[in-house]
A protein has these predicted regions:
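N-terminal active-site beta-alpha-beta segment that forms phosphate/nucleotide-binding
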Residues: 2-99, 104-109
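Conserved phosphate- and dinucleotide-binding cores of soluble alpha/beta proteins
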Residues: 84-190
Length: 190
């Protein structure tokens, strides 16, 4: 069965909202096991995101702690959204955080990271299809950013759910993931 991204967004938002805190914690532990199978030795700058607790997002802070413990040379950066210009850029982490218009934590805008400096990015998503196309919250920030990013960028999706059938409404602006991890599997697309 084929599905549109809007239909997938609706289904996956409901599934995500139904997750309990303990279910999320268990799946985060399983996601961490999958992340441990990835070779991080060629990553020097990792772009990530701060999880939204009210959206039951995967705990990327847990993943980064593991990665930085084993690979202390990796520097992390996080997005700052410019809602007026419908774009985002990444900045190296700061100890002090600020909330943006969407209630998402962001670093202070001091050390912007050029897109060609980022080796690997953890991409937030609600779900993905069998071709590596992601469905997010529908604002398009990541699609626009990934379109201008380094062509060798390793794009890793992090999902609580297995892939859906192929989305019927992908277009040239949809940048597929390199791979996506779920609690039970790692899917490679490139």
């Amino acid at each position: 069965m084929h599905i549109t991204k809007a239909e997938a967004r609706n289904i996956l938002s409901q599934k995500r909202a139904a997750l309990t805190e303990s279910a999320c914690m268990k799946m985060d532990d399983l996601l961490l096991i999958q992340l441990q199978r990835i070779d991080w030795s060629t990553t020097s700058v990792l772009a990530s995101f701060y999880p939204l607790a009210n959206k039951n997002e995967p705990n990327t802070l847990l993943f980064e702690k593991y990665i930085k413990t084993l690979y202390p040379f990796i520097r992390c950066c996080y997005p700052i959204v410019n809602a007026e210009q419908h774009q985002m850029d990444f900045y190296f982490e700061t100890e002090t955080l600020q909330l943006n218009a969407y209630g998402i934590q962001e670093p202070l805008p001091f050390n912007q990271v050029s897109p060609n400096m980022i080796d690997t990015i953890l991409v937030p998503l609600l779900g993905f299809d069998q071709k590596g196309h992601r469905v997010g919250y529908g604002k398009g920030y990541y699609d626009r950013y990934l379109a201008k990013a380094n062509k060798d960028l390793q794009k890793i999706g992090v999902s609580y759910f297995e892939p859906m059938d192929n989305f019927t409404d992908t277009n040239e602006f949809d940048v597929p993931l390199s791979c996506c991890i779920t609690p039970w599997n790692t899917y490679a697309f490139e």
